[in-house]
Design a protein with these regions (language model features):
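Structured C-terminal cap/extension of enzyme domains
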Residues: 39-47, 191, 195-366
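Active-site mouth loops of central-metabolism enzymes
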Residues: 19-29, 76-95, 121-125, 220-229
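Conserved, mostly hydrophobic/aromatic
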Residues: 6, 18, 46, 59, ...
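Generic structural signal for well-ordered alpha-helices
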Residues: 3, 35, 56, 60, ...
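Active-site beta-loop-alpha junctions enriched in small/polar residues
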Residues: 21-23, 49-51, 75-79, 115-118, ...
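Glycine/proline-rich, positively charged
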Residues: 26, 40, 86-208
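Short hydrophobic/aromatic-enriched beta-strand-loop microsegments
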Residues: 69-72, 166-175, 268-275
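N-terminal binding-site loop/beta-alpha segment at the start of enzyme catalytic domains
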Residues: 1-76, 80, 141
Length: 366
């Protein structure tokens, strides 16, 4: 397992976590075994916006004795009073739900307390007016909530809430379908979504990824907007390549599904190549690097995807990205303009010219 550091909290978080949308489907015995295997395999981050309330005692049974090794993100607004998932902006309901979750998880603290499911500005206004944000802040002062998160599918709302509140982690729906305008939660333009990634990277706000497979749509050739099924591994790699991403949270409910996720690190590079998405990217995305590294190997040894990522972040004002760029073994000035990458790029990026542009830009920064 590989890990990434949340710059705002210092937490060391596994690149692959577990979402709980259907954890309950494995039943107590099967799901407990799956969760124990996940932690044994190095997974340490778990989202608890569960599809059913029965997931919480499963987590409590499976992980209560491993609590100091894991992180929970718990949502203030998720209501399980009816048994299944519900959404509420009523403070009394939210308070009772969080207390119930903690009791069933057999824990007394929350690693990341989330401002839950804010998809419209009116949601945020009601959330604050009803005192739910104040509730989270009070619990943070008491040490019950360690850090504050936000879950949303809408770039404009995310930007507004990040302006208004101090956020340490964002839960955002990230996959190639949504990023290029296809799917139920494909909110915001390609550029607006990219701005969220870049802002989070710049400000040190980690992103945990929900819906990495677009609800399974991307795994089915008939449903996929790309006309071809992607694998779970391609979707995970795509998400991890976006700026700001700390962890991807696929669902799982049994050991077999967990083992399949853990096998991500055993895959050859070609199994992770998601460049097929170029078949359906919009015109405004053509000519823009998506860091897929389909252009590898570079004859001069450049990591073209990473060089592009640092450049995009630097232009967005991320000073740390400039320092990271300068520590690369080979940078844009080492490009020999052989054209190998230009001929291989499925997104029609003239990388040879771009390397000259990047080199000049980075050298201009003192």
């Amino acid at each position: 397992m590989n890990y990434r550091i949340n710059k705002r909290t210092g937490d060391r978080i596994s690149e692959i976590g577990i979402g709980s949308a259907y954890m309950y489907a494995g039943g107590m015995d099967g799901a407990v075994k799956a969760l124990r295997r996940a932690v044994e395999g190095g997974i340490n981050y778990f989202d608890l916006a569960a599809g059913d309330g029965s997931s919480f005692p499963i987590y409590g049974e499976a992980l209560h004795d491993l609590r100091d090794r894991i992180f929970y993100q718990i949502h203030f607004g998720a209501d399980y009073s009816a048994g299944t998932y519900g959404w509420s902006l009523e403070p009394d309901v939210v308070k009772r739900s969080v207390e119930w979750q903690l009791k069933n998880l057999r824990t007394d603290y929350i690693d990341y307390g989330f401002i839950h499911c804010q998809d419209e500005i009116s949601d945020w206004e009601t959330y604050r007016e009803n005192g739910i944000l104040d509730m989270i802040l009070k619990l943070k002062k008491m040490g019950v909530v360690h850090h504050i998160g936000l879950s949303s599918h809408t770039p404009g709302v995310i930007q507004r809430i990040m302006d208004d509140a101090e956020i340490d982690m964002l839960m955002f729906s990230v996959n190639p379908a949504y990023d290029y305008g296809h799917g139920e939660y494909a909110n915001g333009s390609t550029d607006e979504r990219a701005e969220v990634y870049k802002r989070c990277e710049k400000e040190g706000v980690g992103i945990s990824v929900m819906k990495p497979f677009s609800g399974g749509q991307l795994l089915d050739a008939e449903q996929s907007p790309f006309g071809k099924a992607l694998t779970q591994y391609q979707c995970i790699k795509y998400a991890l390549d976006r700026p700001g991403i700390l962890t991807v949270l696929p669902g799982a409910s049994n050991i077999e599904e967990v083992e399949h996720l853990l096998a991500y690190y055993d895959q050859p590079e070609e199994a992770l190549d998601y460049s097929v998405i170029s078949s359906l990217t919009p015109k405004e995305a053509s000519g823009k690097c998506v860091y897929c590294n389909h252009c590898k190997p570079c004859p001069a040894g450049l990591d073209i995807g990473l060089i592009n990522k640092y450049y995009d972040l630097a232009k967005a004002g991320d000073a740390l990205a400039v320092e990271h760029y300068r520590t690369l073994e080979k940078n844009a000035s080492d490009c020999i303009s052989c054209g190998h990458c230009d001929s291989r790029c499925p997104f029609h990026v003239n990388q040879s010219a771009r390397m000259q542009e990047i080199s000049a830009y980075m050298e201009s920064i003192k």
